[in-house]
């Protein structure tokens, strides 16, 4: 397919995958690196000597990146992981629970051509942390592998792409299945030229918005700049592993990322400067409309922006968002005071921190339309604004650059 620099371009690739049966495969997958705690990592290490956490997020003993590369090479040599003989795009059905309701999200694993944000083709919406990019770049240099996918969304309001995908896998058996806790995964490989061509042609009419994986995407751009000189236009280094999902998919869920603050003096002063406080009942949390809720010592207060609050430092595209107001008006001074700020998408876990004296800022989740509006305006939301649930596991579909 001729390359048009003004449209998104995806390509099939030969995935590296585990050869285990469904009853074992779930023990080998892990979450992406940025949601693995040290305790999670220890558990996953003990779960199997071949759990993908050893590659995705190795323990910091000695040279962790060399260790990850050595493990991956050894697994390939032993046949623990095998590369598919033919290139394909990979349909991934991910079933999970929201409360007691079972939900399915469908996405496509493919190779997505890299574009800088200013080209307006692959659109970021969130700022990143330099340290995380340094870590991912070191891993990419050592393994020469996209170990986990970026998560992108695209417009498909009329179901053109979703319908085409369904037709290609209808009545066929998945090539891989896995169960991880209450989540189920099924993967189909579409390797025929017509199926791949239909998906590429349909997606070429659309922008791709990065939902999750901004650090991995920027790392891939940095690696291309570092080592891509003289590479062919279709060289693997010019693409990144992506999991792409329709913005209208009923399984696309976005949670808020709440702020947990330890050290309250600067926070209280900032609140009183910019906001009015209104006590509310804890049971009303689920009904809260736009705003920020402060929780401390069992007390819940909803914040209302004062009429004379100066929002000139906040970009117009996102100054109405609670997360932007919290970051720009409240937490900037808190960080300068030396207080500790952590992030938690689970509301119950965030509230549990108040028992140890922390203050929690509960924030409303950002909807997909707002993300598109911010990205189309060329703006970036603060780090840790969104949490797309559930995460796409690492190890299910891996993309070597060799």
Short names for language-model regions:
Residues 1-402:
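Surface-exposed, charge/polar-rich loops and edge strands
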